[in-house]
């Protein structure tokens, strides 16, 4: 029989223990930074009909707060990973590369595949090693995700940035928004704690589930979303280590709940709130056209603002441009600058183009976690025509023949490019220090 002293001691121990379901206070987003959306992963189809992808788990640095860089992890970049868009019936081949200093795996959360390629703890890829997996997609449309699953370091690797989305695209016609990054929006919600404005998992780790005091959406601190006055589809992932979310709109308006973890519902449901456990996904459609002029936010049940949403009117000044043949992504600041994720290599030809052939290039100044900076983009050996900026007709001072276009963070332009001579030409940012730091590429023009 337990004596009185033991009983008193155990009672005190239980009193001092933190309850497993206790919620750490989460601070509201101040809505200072526009969210950015993960890039869509590019694939190449081989002669056997497989869509080929490459995913690298790698180390990086992320500027969550101005002039404060955190050590982070990402897939094919500094933080998070690209979105893989698949369809039912696709045959898929993915080269998985571990560029970390520790073991990792690549787990396809929610994907129905053979256990040999599921990416569980037994399917370790060691540092510096790689392997290729194959599978066929046998599921209907759904929002899934991928993340590491190495024992015992899953929590640490996910917290530090290893997460990405995987769509199985709509196979049946429906009226749901489907323009990725415009009205079909991936929303990865996470909570983290920053120590002196830097990530430090070891100092914030909790064995009963690490919860943070700062909300991030798609890796952005103090996020906000600006969207047109139309229906928008939010593909919500609770990518937190341990925090449950109970999401609703701040104006208490209802929305359509259209899909759960495994895919679309037979019939959409009108709801005013949804629960999201860690790793859970749900899709909702919000009709912003019915909320003109309103300040609305996606909030957690304790009124914590997760994502302020502001409306912008539909633009009537759209510019119709031909199909894009080349995409240029300008990224970074200081010496962390790249074009399409690459530093300049004199032995690498990035693009080719035929002599006298008109092509449309899309130039994007990718906004980073702190907003980024303006980049003047220059092409050697040609004068180009600016067709559009952010989908609209270019401003008057961007018309006429040009060889430099300067883009603000987040801006995207389409330009018409024709080369009248053959040879190898440079394209680069014309901030000279950025050029010297590798923000440059090469195009070869041939007959």
From Swiss-Prot:
Cu cation 1 binds at residues 107, 378. CDD domains: CuRO_1_CueO_FtsP, CuRO_2_CueO_FtsP, CuRO_3_CueO_FtsP. Signal peptide: none annotated. The keyword Metal-binding applies. Cu cation 4 binds at residues 375, 429, 434, 439. Its main location: cytoplasm. Its cofactor is Cu cation. GO terms for molecular function: copper ion binding; oxidoreductase activity. One of its GO terms (cellular component) is cytoplasm. InterPro entries: Cu-oxidase-like_N, Cu-oxidase_C, Cu-oxidase_fam, Cu_oxidase_CS, Cu_oxidase_Cu_BS, Cupredoxin. It is found in: Cytoplasm. Cu cation 3 binds at residues 149, 380, 428. Disulfide bonds: none annotated. It comes from the Bacteria. Residues 1-29 are annotated as: Disordered. Cu cation 2 binds at residues 109, 147, 430. Binds 4 Cu cations per monomer. Its EC number is 1.-.-.-. May be involved in copper homeostasis and oxidative stress response. Belongs to the multicopper oxidase family. PANTHER family: BILIRUBIN OXIDASE, CUPREDOXIN SUPERFAMILY PROTEIN. This is Multicopper oxidase mco. It comes from Staphylococcus haemolyticus (strain JCSC1435). The lineage of its organism: Bacteria, Bacillati, Bacillota, Bacilli, Bacillales.
């Amino acid at each position: 029989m337990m004596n009185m002293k033991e009983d008193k001691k155990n009672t005190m121990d239980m009193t001092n223990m933190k309850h497993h379901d206790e919620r750490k206070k989460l601070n509201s987003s101040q809505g200072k930074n526009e969210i950015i959306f993960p890039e869509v992963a590019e694939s190449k189809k081989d002669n056997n009909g497989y869509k080929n992808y490459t995913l690298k788990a790698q180390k990086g640095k992320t500027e969550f707060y101005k002039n404060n860089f955190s050590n982070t992890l990402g897939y094919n970049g500094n933080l998070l990973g690209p979105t893989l868009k698949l369809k039912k019936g696709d045959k898929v081949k993915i080269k998985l590369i571990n560029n970390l200093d520790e073991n990792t795996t690549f787990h396809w959360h929610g994907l129905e595949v053979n256990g040999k390629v599921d990416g569980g703890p037994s399917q370790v890829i060691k540092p510096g090693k790689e392997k290729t997996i194959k599978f066929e997609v046998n599921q209907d449309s759904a929002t899934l995700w991928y993340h590491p699953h190495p024992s015992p370091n899953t929590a640490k690797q996910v917290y530090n940035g290893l997460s990405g989305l995987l769509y199985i695209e709509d196979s049946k016609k429906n009226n749901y928004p489907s323009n990725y990054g415009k009205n079909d929006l991936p929303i990865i919600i996470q909570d983290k704690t920053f120590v002196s404005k830097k990530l430090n998992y070891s100092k914030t780790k909790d064995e009963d589930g690490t919860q943070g005091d700062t909300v991030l959406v798609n890796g952005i601190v103090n996020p906000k979303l600006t969207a047109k006055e139309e229906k928008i589809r939010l593909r919500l992932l609770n990518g937190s280590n341990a925090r449950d979310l109970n999401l609703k709109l701040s104006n208490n308006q209802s929305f359509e709940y259209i899909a759960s973890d495994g895919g679309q519902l037979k019939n959409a449901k009108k709801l005013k709130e949804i629960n999201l456990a860690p790793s859970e996904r749900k899709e909702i459609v919000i009709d912003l056209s019915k909320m003109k002029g309103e300040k609305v936010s996606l909030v957690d049940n304790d009124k914590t603002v997760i994502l302020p949403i502001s409306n912008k009117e539909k633009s009537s000044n759209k510019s119709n441009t031909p199909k894009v043949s080349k995409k240029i992504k300008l990224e970074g600041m200081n010496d962390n600058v790249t074009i399409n994720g690459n530093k300049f290599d004199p032995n690498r030809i990035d693009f080719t183009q035929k002599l006298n052939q008109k092509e449309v290039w899309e130039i994007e100044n990718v906004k980073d976690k702190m907003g980024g900076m303006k980049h003047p983009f220059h092409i050697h050996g040609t004068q180009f025509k600016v067709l559009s900026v952010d989908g609209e007709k270019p401003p008057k001072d961007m018309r006429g023949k040009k060889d430099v276009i300067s883009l603000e963070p987040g801006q995207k332009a389409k330009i018409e490019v024709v080369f009248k001579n053959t040879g190898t030409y440079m394209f680069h940012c014309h901030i000279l220090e950025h050029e010297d730091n590798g923000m440059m590429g090469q195009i070869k023009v041939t007959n």
